[in-house]
């Protein structure tokens, strides 16, 4: 019979139990009692998740997908590969040691963190040097196998593969090539796999998502020898690829001496034919046809039609699965009491997706009639989504269709706009500002909670937030900032806030997914055509502007970031949805301008995150992403100044696209790199104004004026004074007011010092 399985289950718990247990553990100083409570929580979550898989009818439960903080870090712990600078004993690694690597300690900073491929999950970046060694590590995976077997489950273990583990790391201390470490890493994996076989594990899923990338030849060539060394003495190995089409590697993957392969049919449906053709008789093929990265209910009839001919060819060698781990999906739709029945009928969270996988397996094995109820309900939902007036708004579709190239262009080029803006605002050289948000204080959180619970009425909430705006304006005036912001006290999240106010978005109560460690995010759902029924931010910006004669920036989240940080409808191209959001934001910019707001910031921190994994797909993405931003921001007059903000660890490869946004001012995150990120501007002359961050807001440390002055002077080596702004790296939402007060006062002081030396060079 065809096997049904998933690649992984969310680890945080249906009520974010892991998040709260972790935070209690850290808050209690990693005491013995706190550690016992954390370990008990982890054990209970694993048991619940395995039972969910069993109740759904899956043929095995996935073990090894659980991690206390991050699965890449946990894999390093399994193979004794944590950074040497921490000095940990790999075999005696404690939870406190593990978290020290993730979060830093008194002696060492935390490991670097970055995005897991093109998802919104963050992994901890391995550190490799010529001295790196691997070997036996923690016993956690074997403990989990024993737990699963004791509960009567059939475990399939899951591990990040050796090639991916090396690829994801960074070379340090003169290591020329991470592949040099593969001969050291393979024996550690081989020993781990041999022990899993001894523990009674029949199958091990080895995740190698790097095959979805434009993989260099040396890495491709290393795959077969590595797996030839791994297979002897190991359980059956299922090499799992996901996140994109891997058909260019089909011959290589089919030639690997493993027992099976997994392919992602959601991100690469066309690749199926390349794998089924001449598929080896000794391998299973796991087809990931239930979307592990989105929230929409599977069209089971459509999936069955896609799988049926494959089943005829492969028989029981066809496995049914999710496209990738369900780590990226919310846990359970049953915990969404506020979503209406119509919308809920279109959705499937992780628990529901396990059932979809099993239903497809049963339909192939027993016929559709055996699971008619599940299939009929899915068919009704699919039909409703295709025709619902709630999803399809003819007015929005007409507006998108009517867009022209002129709508994506400002009336004048930057030089003319800059002259008009200088005349309007009369700012000094090196103008100072912030990125947007100020501290979300306990008072703000209490007022928001009281309002949501009905304890505080709407008028009381507005008054409480207005008081916070007044505080923010008064503080900025006391610092001496040149351009102010209202502080965003009323916003719980830079995407959810706008999603609550636009038609076509829905907000969940409990649709949390893990971002990293204990941090969870609750992405909005973009279920239909996006429309703005009324202004969203004009009241707040206008009130703030009424408190000062200095310019106050209106603050918006850009269309691409709204898209990237949401669960997006899958029934039309993402580019179309981006344009719909852009049109809504365009209306908001015009409303802000009409209300007298002369500077409007449209943030796009996720522009680079949306880059496709393969280079061949990137130009198309950047074309529509840039167009969406320009649609949002180009309707205003020449003397209205458009700002944008981006936080990247690197952006040199997309600088032409950033310039093509044609924002009057861009602010970027540069402090941690000591302005090295500005090196890209030595070969590409950015034409408009720029504010490289001079204050690292991610650290509680407060810089002094001398330190900030040094950074401003470094920036002036690359950016002309007449186009340079002075600002922090990012928003100040997570900082405390005492830190903000000291840092911004120092920033203004430093800017004034440097201003005296450049004033003569800046045109009036």
From Swiss-Prot:
Example GO biological process: methylation
> So which cofactors does this thing need?
Zn(2+)
Q: Where does L-homocysteine bind?
A: 435-437, 488, 603
Q: What is its EC number?
A: 2.1.1.14
Which positions are annotated as binding L-methionine?
Answer: 435-437, 488, 603
| Gene that produces this protein | metE
Q: Name one GO molecular function term.
A: zinc ion binding
Q: What is this protein called?
A: 5-methyltetrahydropteroyltriglutamate--homocysteine methyltransferase
Record: residues binding Zn(2+): 645, 647, 669, 730
Cite the annotated pathway.
Amino-acid biosynthesis; L-methionine biosynthesis via de novo pathway; L-methionine from L-homocysteine (MetE route): step 1/1
* Signal sequence range: none
Which HAMAP family does UniProt cross-reference here? Meth_synth
**Organism of origin:** Burkholderia thailandensis (strain ATCC 700388 / DSM 13276 / CCUG 48851 / CIP 106301 / E264)
Q: Where is the active site?
A: 698
The UniProt function text for this chain reads: Catalyzes the transfer of a methyl group from 5-methyltetrahydrofolate to homocysteine resulting in methionine formation.
Instruction: Kindly indicate whether the keyword Amino-acid biosynthesis belongs to this entry.
Output: yes
Name the InterPro entries on file.
Cbl-indep_Met_Synth_N, Cobalamin-indep_Met_synthase, Met_Synth_C/arc, UROD/MetE-like_sf
Free-text cofactor note: Binds 1 zinc ion per subunit.
């Amino acid at each position: 019979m065809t096997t049904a399985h998933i690649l992984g289950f969310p680890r945080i718990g249906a009520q974010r139990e892991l998040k709260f247990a972790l935070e209690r553990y850290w808050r209690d100083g990693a005491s013995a009692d706190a550690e016992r409570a954390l370990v008990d929580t982890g054990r209970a979550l694993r048991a619940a998740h395995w039972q969910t898989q069993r109740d759904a009818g899956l043929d095995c439960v996935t073990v090894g997908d659980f991690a206390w903080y991050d699965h890449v870090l946990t894999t390093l712990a399994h193979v004794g590969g944590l950074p040497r600078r921490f000095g940990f004993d790999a075999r005696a690694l404690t939870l406190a040691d593990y978290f020290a690597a993730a979060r830093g300690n008194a002696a060492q900073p935390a490991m670097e963190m970055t995005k897991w491929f093109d998802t919104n999950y963050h992994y901890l970046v391995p550190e490799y040097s010529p001295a790196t060694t691997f070997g036996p590590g923690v016993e956690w995976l074997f403990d989990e196998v024993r737990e699963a077997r004791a509960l009567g489950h059939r475990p399939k273990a899951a591990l990040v593969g050796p090639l991916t583990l090396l690829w994801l790391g960074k070379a340090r201390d003169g290591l020329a090539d991470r592949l040099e470490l593969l001969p050291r890493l393979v024996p550690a994996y081989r020993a781990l796999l041999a022990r899993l076989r001894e523990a009674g594990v029949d199958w091990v899923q080895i995740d190698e998502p790097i095959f979805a990338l434009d993989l260099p030849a040396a890495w491709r060539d290393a795959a077969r020898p590595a797996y030839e060394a791994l297979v002897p003495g190991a359980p059956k190995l299922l090499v799992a690829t996901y996140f994109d089409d891997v058909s260019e590697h089909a011959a290589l993957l089919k030639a690997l001496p493993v027992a099976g392969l997994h392919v992602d049919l959601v991100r690469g449906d066309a690749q199926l034919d390349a794998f089924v053709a001449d598929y080896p008789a000794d391998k299973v093929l796991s087809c990931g046809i239930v979307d592990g990265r989105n929230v929409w209910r599977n069209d089971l009839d459509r999936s069955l039609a896609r799988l049926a001919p494959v089943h005829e060819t492969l028989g029981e060698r066809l496995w049914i699965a999710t496209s990738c781990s369900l780590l990226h999906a919310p846990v359970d739709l049953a915990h969404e009491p506020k979503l209406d029945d119509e919308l809920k009928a279109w959705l499937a969270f992780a628990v529901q997706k396990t059932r979809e996988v099993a239903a497809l397996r049963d339909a192939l094995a027993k016929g559709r009639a055996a699971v008619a109820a599940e299939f009929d309900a899915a068919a009704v939902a699919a039909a409703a989504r295709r025709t619902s007036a709630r999803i399809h708004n003819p007015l929005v579709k007409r507006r998108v269709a009517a867009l022209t190239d002129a709508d994506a262009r400002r009336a004048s080029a930057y030089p003319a706009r800059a002259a008009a803006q200088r005349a309007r605002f009369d700012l000094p050289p090196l103008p100072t500002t912030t990125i947007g948000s100020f501290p979300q204080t306990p008072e703000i959180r209490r007022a928001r909670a009281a309002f949501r619970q009905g304890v505080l009425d709407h008028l009381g909430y507005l008054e409480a937030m207005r008081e916070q705006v007044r505080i923010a304006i008064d503080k900025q005036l006391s610092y001496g900032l040149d351009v102010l912001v209202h502080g965003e006290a009323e916003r719980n999240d830079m995407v959810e806030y706008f999603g609550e106010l636009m038609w076509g978005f829905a907000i969940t109560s409990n649709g949390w997914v893990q971002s990293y460690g204990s941090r969870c995010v609750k992405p909005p759902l973009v279920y239909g055509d996006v429309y703005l029924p009324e202004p969203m931010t004009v009241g707040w910006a206008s009130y703030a502007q009424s408190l000062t004669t200095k310019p106050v920036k209106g603050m918006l989240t850009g269309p691409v970031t709204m898209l990237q940080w949401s669960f997006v409808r899958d029934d039309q191209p993402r580019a179309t949805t981006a344009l719909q959001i852009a049109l809504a934001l365009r209306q908001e910019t015009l409303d802000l301008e009409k209300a007298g707001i002369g500077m409007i910031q449209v943030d796009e921190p996720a522009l680079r995150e949306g880059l496709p994994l393969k280079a061949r797909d990137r130009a198309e993405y950047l074309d529509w992403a840039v167009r969406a931003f320009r649609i949002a921001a180009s309707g205003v007059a020449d003397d209205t100044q458009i700002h944008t903000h981006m936080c990247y660890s690197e952006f040199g490869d997309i600088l032409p696209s950033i310039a093509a946004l044609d924002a009057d001012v861009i602010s970027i995150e540069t402090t941690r790199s000591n302005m090295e990120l500005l090196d890209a501007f030595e070969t590409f002359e950015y034409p408009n104004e720029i504010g490289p961050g001079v204050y690292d807001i991610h650290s509680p440390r407060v810089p002094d004026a001398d330190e900030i002055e040094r950074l401003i002077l470094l920036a002036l080596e690359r950016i002309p004074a007449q186009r340079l702004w002075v600002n922090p790296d990012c928003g100040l939402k997570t900082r405390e007011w005492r830190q903000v007060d000291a840092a911004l006062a120092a920033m203004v002081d430093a800017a004034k010092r440097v201003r005296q030396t450049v004033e003569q060079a800046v045109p009036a």
